[in-house]
Amino acid sequence: MLNKTNNTKNSISNKYSKIIKGLENIFEKIKKELVKKKELSQDNFKVWEEKNQHLVHGFAWIATYIEALRQINNWGIELANKNKLNEFEQLILDISFIEYIRQILNGIPMSQTEFIKITDFESINKNDELKISENFNFSNVSELKERLVKIAINNDNIITLENTGLETEYEQIREQFQKFNSLNVCNNANKWHLEDKLIPQKIIDDLASLGVFGLTIPEKYGGLGLNKLAMCVVSEELARGYIGVGSLATRTEIASELILNDGTETQKDFWLPKISQGETIPAACFTEPDSGSDLGSITTKAIKDDGKFLISGNKTWITHASRSNLLIILARTNPDILLKHKGLSIFLVPKNQGKEDEFFPNKSISGTEIKVLGYRGMKEFELRLDNLEVEKISLLGENENSGFSQLMKTFESARIQTAARAVGVAQNALDLAISYASNRKQFNKSIINFERVYNKIAMMIIEIALGRQLTYFAAKNKDLGFRCDLEAGMAKLLCARIAWSCADNSLQIHGGNGYALEYDISRILCDARVLSIFEGSAEIQAQIVAKGLIGR
């Protein structure tokens, strides 16, 4: 048995590591081509990228696929080293490479109508394709998928179908929140969604008692002091129950990281214990009606007045704005709009909590609810700030014009957490697909036995595993203190698309019933759609990844 395991380990290491090396060579050829074109254009990156978006963003997608395959291969090797690479995990590994190599060669879907393949680049020829494709038998993939799904049906009592490779402590955390979902969330999520009301306060109180809001806050400030990988596991499981519940922690994660990174000691001592205990519920006020991805163009002003600041302007897409009692406001402290992001500051502004019949009791804050398709439970608002008086001590770090750089430090964690939420949403869609397809019978057999059904389910399984490992890789890098903007961006880019694909395919498996509001999958489809829009749209995310790759 030991020899067999060693042979398996060596086979994985040699076969797929060699393929990844070949993909890395292709990546370098494309990168050199793009760098040369950029240099010849004499444009800065932004101008050049806007003229060549399809190829530049396509490069980001190809790089993301290569990184995802690298991480799933590392996962397989690690499991083999621990004698835990079972048939199911081996099938995930094999199908992942077959399917993603096929897409790299024939077209990666950047969206439903946009595809990129390596031969779209001048530097890649048919010989490059052949060196990669000759390693695979694409004709037997359906048989592999059928076997994968048959094993999955018998594994449906396991929280994650595959062995994630994480240490026991993380899987214990996962189990704790899976039980929380089963008792409190799963049977209520569709009701909360259809009623379009706030998630009950009791859920927030229960999450606070579990330490969710202080998950990564140091113990000295009342938190649990856990790492970003633990945050991923918690976010993933909570979002698997309901994305609204999974996103409650995101509000506190952004706020606490801002304060931890750049707050004064007084601000840390005052706010962090309250956030940890769930006493303070923050809302991030960054986006404006005419400033979404381009935060440098915001116009909300913070004007000094007798030792205080008066903030005026409009904000939009403010999640949980009414129930929150702390607004994290990004405003312009330097009136020169040409300074763009260099003239912005962040303010920690306490406010009174709203109620269902009075959203904003503060006289200087007014707002209207934005009705949304999905991602409900916290409510979205457009806010009007009219000479909102703010004490000087509310200025983050008491540093003016540093807001954008302060905010940038949180982007890695925010995108990692969003990727984890996307994995949770995708896993929920998969859970429902397996259950429905196993129980739904047509033509005297369960529909899961039809090729086009089990092929869909198999793709969900392998893509969730790919997205999960890419997300964990980004989180581990963050925990080690490494710069991980690329890894976080790749995870967010890929996992958002995976969530939408899984939700869409799961609904298709449900057929007409999936279109009925009473079925959970109709909600999950609505929830999944937002993941490629917020925390950096898919287009902006691809731009950022490409810029990082070409600039390094």
Regions found by a protein language model. Give the residues of each.
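Alpha-helical interface subdomain recognition
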Residues: 2-241, 245, 250, 262-267, ...
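Short Gly/Pro-enriched turn/cap motifs at secondary-structure boundaries
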Residues: 290-293, 317-320, 337-338, 372-379
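A short core secondary-structure module
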Residues: 308, 312-363
